[in-house]
Amino acid sequence: MRCISINLDEDTMKKAFLGLTALFFAVLVSGCNQLTQYTISEQEVNQALAKHNNYEKDIGVAGLVNAHILLTDLNSQIGREEPDRVTLTGKAKINVTSLFGPQEADMQLKMKAQPVFDVQQGAVYLRDLEIVDAQVQPEKMAAVMKSLTPYLNQSLKSYFNQKPAYVLSVDRSKGEALAKKFAKGLQVEPGQLVIPFTQ
């Protein structure tokens, strides 16, 4: 059996050592991050938002126009369009009753909200929600929907002010259990929410 001899010069050894050192520190920093903060991904927020699908509400002006709203397909984009804000999209199915009889419309909504962490509840809320864009089909319903949008906005704002978008659980993972116990606030980064354990 032959033994293969490998001769490494000093420069190669230095490069290998530096590479291993960099890898060690990268792993160390990653481990430290897990001990000092918890990250909630966009995907996790969207999975939690799915629980708010099929939100239903009656809105309008009594005696003039009333609408039954069904909200579906909620999705979030975290800190991408605007720093420290969450952009939500969703579909609204609307059945309108007015002096002109029953009518139906579909709205594609775009909303923005401020993520806020409630330390006592261990929950993330989407506060001060605002509808920033609404596409209506059929187009002939656009004027009616425009008059109803402020009522829809207020209804959704009130709902998300009271209902958390994401609640930390001690059962899902050790990291999440630590976050629920030691969380100090909330930071918004593109694509994720970061909960630090220290001030």
PLM regions: where:
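Short, Lys/Arg-enriched N-terminal segments with co-localized hydrophobic residues
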Residues: 1-12
